[in-house]
A protein has these predicted regions:
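Electropositive polyanion-binding surfaces
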Residues: 1-273
């Protein structure tokens, strides 16, 4: 019990550093599905992260960063986890949304991670939390795997990798191979000869397979949500506008289910955006 108390104290200090450096902390949009004995989805809930999960995340990030620093300093051939700044057109769209919500845009053309993190904190636990957090997340570039340490924008870290996680990933195993050879005393020359081409291929393959897995997960999630909502066709729900396009509004319910309200369905109503 005392060990957990000490770990919690360390977690609080890490979380404070996390906030101070401008790392982003999004409120989760992840859904939790309720299945009956036949495997049919009968309900959808918003998944909530508990304190234990947040503690694990902070320690995991620290371990991943520490290993990435070691690899960069030793000039090892490596697989880094990188994340670039958002594209300008996405930043412009986010700015327009903030203005329409009555918020001051807290950044210039190229927002820093710290500025976006402050925006997330400013709207946390407010009526605008969901729409702002959702759209800041959509503004972000996709993280990927690379053999060069170009930094992680979202975590506001110069060095990052995927060394450990609650579920083992291929990039974890790839760098375990490299680190195993390194700690056994292999020379930098032999490591470069053995792994230089490997880290290039592993980075490309891991990024591609991650995207394929995310697409599959998104499709399955959509199917479960549609299955759960099918008995409720025709009912009214309260939702939050999570996106605006020329063809309509995206509306998200409290349980994370999102749907499109087409503009032609609003033609009889006075609506100003």
């Amino acid at each position: 019990e005392r060990d957990l108390e000490v770990l919690y104290e360390i977690y609080e200090k890490l979380a404070a550093l996390h906030t101070a450096r401008g790392a982003m902390d999004f409120e989760s949009e992840e859904a939790k599905f309720v299945l009956d004995e036949k495997g049919i989805c009968t309900g959808v809930k918003k998944r909530v992260r508990g304190v234990a999960e947040r503690m694990i995340e902070e320690f995991m990030v620290l371990a991943n960063e520490s290993v990435a620093v070691i690899a960069r300093r030793a000039q090892l051939p490596f697989v880094y986890r990188t994340h670039s700044a958002p594209q300008s057109k996405r930043v412009d769209a986010l700015s327009d949304l903030l203005i329409s919500c009555g918020l001051e845009v807290p950044f210039q053309e190229e927002p820093s991670a710290w500025e976006l993190a402050q925006l997330l904190e400013q709207t946390r636990h407010t009526s605008l939390e969901r729409v702002v957090h959702t759209n800041v997340l959509r503004t972000m570039a996709k993280a990927k795997y690379e053999p060069n340490p170009t930094g992680h924008y979202g975590l506001s870290l110069a060095d990052y990798t995927h060394f450990t996680s609650p579920i083992r990933r291929y990039p974890d195993l790839a760098i375990h191979r490299i680190l195993s050879a390194y700690v056994k005393g292999a020379s930098l020359e032999s490591l470069q000869r053995k792994f230089s081409a490997f880290v290039q291929e592993a980075s490309i393959q891991s990024s591609e397979r991650e995207q394929a897995a995310m697409n599959a997960e998104r499709d399955i999630s959509d199917c479960y949500k549609a299955e759960a909502m099918k008995p409720h066709v025709g009912e009214c729900f309260e939702g939050v506008v999570s996106g605006v396009t020329h063809y309509g509004l995206y509306v998200q319910l409290e349980n994370t289910v999102e749907g499109l309200l087409r503009s032609d369905a609003l033609s009889e109503h006075a609506l100003t955006l």
